[in-house]
UniProtKB/Swiss-Prot annotation, chains A, B:
SUPFAM superfamilies assigned: Cytidine deaminase-like, Dihydrofolate reductase-like
Cofactors that this protein relies on: Zn(2+)
Family: In the N-terminal section; belongs to the cytidine and deoxycytidylate deaminase family. In the C-terminal section; belongs to the HTP reductase family.
Pathway: Cofactor biosynthesis; riboflavin biosynthesis; 5-amino-6-(D-ribitylamino)uracil from GTP: step 2/4; Cofactor biosynthesis; riboflavin biosynthesis; 5-amino-6-(D-ribitylamino)uracil from GTP: step 3/4
Enzyme Commission number(s) of this protein: 3.5.4.26, 1.1.1.193
Keywords per UniProt: Hydrolase, Metal-binding, Multifunctional enzyme, NADP, Oxidoreductase, Riboflavin biosynthesis, Zinc
Lineage of origin: Bacteria, Pseudomonadati, Pseudomonadota, Gammaproteobacteria, Enterobacterales
Organism of origin: Buchnera aphidicola subsp. Baizongia pistaciae (strain Bp)
Residues annotated to bind substrate: 168, 184, 204, 207, 301
Protein name, entry field: Riboflavin biosynthesis protein RibD
Length: 372, 372
């Protein structure tokens, strides 16, 4: 019970890094000596100290004989920082409680082995689900090579995204559209299509989220920590030009193409050629490539064609649908273009995860039918 | 503050009649003498005593000099029961607090006038909104001549009601379908179409709701109180025959037609001829006719054609949509057949009133955009 109590606190601490640690996971650490919390820390940003180091430094002498509660297995290899396992022994920690092992198959279990070898008592699995939940993208990328993929949509209650004449501004309310900024800021990359750019000419950046109380708290240590997601535009026909708003907007942008062109592109634009036999951009290749760029969380913001292509591949982990209390009718544009199913058992299934009212609209979060 | 406190109790009592009082409204009454509740009552069923009479009888002598809290203006005319106003004075009540006036324009205000004339102090308007809310159908029928109209639908998250081949069994889960029984039992009439009867051959009755705890409580005084809603089938082409399941099933059923036929119908079937110049059944005429049958609450359970016709008339007070976490795609059948709108400002708008999860599905209750 005590272990759960302190691990909950460590997870709460870990969440403070939710907007800033990626590609690293969120990690929190609490050091407890004789039922007194003597130190705590959390990981802020890649290249900065790990949670354990902050916690040990605040504990000082009091770490001797204490228990460390860590939301993720401590590292035992020299990366950008010296290994946390060494620090834990150096400070005299006698027991380590770990929520879950490191999912990186190259290092998973090594920290535990190291600690045990150095006479430290190790408990594994306390609130493991919760710890994995706050690092879904990191865990999925490490274990499958594919980032966590969210698909964002906005529709009427009868599942329509635009009128027959294309008008869709605006089906949902200001508040719902502002909420999208918060979904974006939790993403490492936003995938969109050249169709969306040609039609809407969006910036695809995170804007005006600093006035949010929670973000103020998360970012108060340094506003510069909030990073813009990488914008990824699928442009197989080279239709995007240097004059589009998203191109002029600073911030890394990947143009995913089959062939490069001879335009002069700003330095923050990177043409990535994804060619294969089919002469089409393979979306699985794309998300695997993004995983290699250490992208944990992808947000898809596109029209029904690209959204449907991802849906058919069965790689959407989360659907985020903003629903306005309007009815657009049968002439309006559908949410998805799918096949003509013969049986209800064949259709894509999800499960409702979280329902909130955002202003006049509903925000539905659904997860893959079989994902936990 | 005390008035609100006691009126809340009276409204809670009134709700006990929610499945049984129609066509009468739900009414509760609390009698308070010197800060002590000395009597209480609620209306159970048309023809039975009014709430005030029960409350006065339980108070007896203690009603003298007491305050009566009544959720609706007491009657002053001799109807099926002697007027409550007379009883209130006879028992020596000195003050009456009324949530709201009787909406029936023929009698509204008469009770208050009578009480004042007999030296009783009258306060009007305590929790009036709450009192109207528990009698929405009654108030709307009395003030507009049109019952409260609910439209029930079931769809996928992309707003589809069936696959292209017509398969719709079942999009939603058992639990959601069972919940529909509770929606039916709160209705005085269910409107459906001959299309639905020919395709699904449903009974359109309330079934298996007595195992519900709340209903057990509501009905414990007498199970016979739960009445079946009147089934109303729009059958302009005389396609329903005596062999359909809903016809064989006992319980009043109105066949709404343009011409009668020569079939021999069971005595619980009533052919109602609604003819007009257009040779079509006018849905406004239909609901006004049902209001004359003292129908307070109508539930529409039909396919997209009839549902859309009601929607276009702008007389739907409440939309009840069960949404399954499935995606049926663009080939599947739409929720509504409407016009090809040119502007988003022209589309039907509602507002989300209540969202609940029923098993795997969502139940959305929406109300008319401008209704309170």
């Amino acid at each position: 019970m005590k272990d759960i109590f302190y691990m909950k606190k460590a997870i709460k601490l870990a969440k403070k890094g939710s907007l800033t640690t990626s590609p690293n996971p969120n990690v929190g650490c609490i050091i407890v000596n004789n039922n007194i919390i003597v130190g705590s820390g959390w990981h802020k940003k890649t290249g900065m100290k790990h949670a354990e180091i902050y916690a040990l430094k605040t504990s000082g002498e009091k770490a001797k004989g204490a228990t460390a509660y860590i939301t993720l297995e401590p590292c035992s290899h020299f990366g950008k920082t010296p290994p946390c396992c060494v620090a834990l022994t150096k400070y005299g920690i006698s027991r380590v409680v770990i929520a879950t092992l490191d999912p990186n198959p190259k290092v998973s279990g090594n920290g535990v082995k190291w600690l045990k070898k150095h006479g430290i008592l190790v408990t594994i699995g306390t609130l493991s689900k919760e710890s994995i939940k706050i690092n879904k993208g990191f865990f999925q990328r490490m274990t499958t090579g594919i980032p966590w993929i969210k698909l964002k949509l906005a529709s009427s209650i009868d599942g329509r995204t635009a009128l027959n004449n294309g008008k869709s501004k605006w089906i949902t309310s200001d508040k719902a559209r502002h909420d999208v900024q918060h979904v974006r800021e939790k993403s490492d990359a936003i995938i969109s299509s050249s169709e969306t750019i040609l039609f809407d000419n969006p910036l695809l950046t995170v804007r005006n989220t600093n006035n949010n109380d929670n973000n103020q708290k998360l970012l108060k240590h340094s506003k510069t920590f909030l990073k813009q997601p990488i914008r990824v535009i699928i442009d197989s026909k080279n239709r995007i030009t240097p004059s589009h708003k998203c191109i002029k907007q600073p911030g890394l942008l990947f143009l995913i193409r089959i062939h490069s062109d001879n335009n002069i592109w700003p330095s923050h634009i990177k043409q990535i050629i994804l060619n294969n036999k089919s002469k089409k951009i393979d979306l699985i290749d794309l998300v695997k490539m993004l995983a290699k760029y250490q992208i944990n969380n992808i947000l898809i913001e596109a029209g029904p064609s690209l959204s449907s292509s991802f849906l058919k591949l069965n790689i959407i982990n989360e659907l985020i649908i903003y629903i306005a209390p309007k009815i657009l009718g049968n002439y309006a544009k559908p949410l998805f273009f799918l096949e003509n199913y013969s049986n209800l058992s064949d259709v894509p299934q999800f499960k409702f995860e979280k329902i909130t009212q955002i202003g006049k609209d509903l925000k539905l979060i659904l997860t893959k039918h079989n994902s936990s």
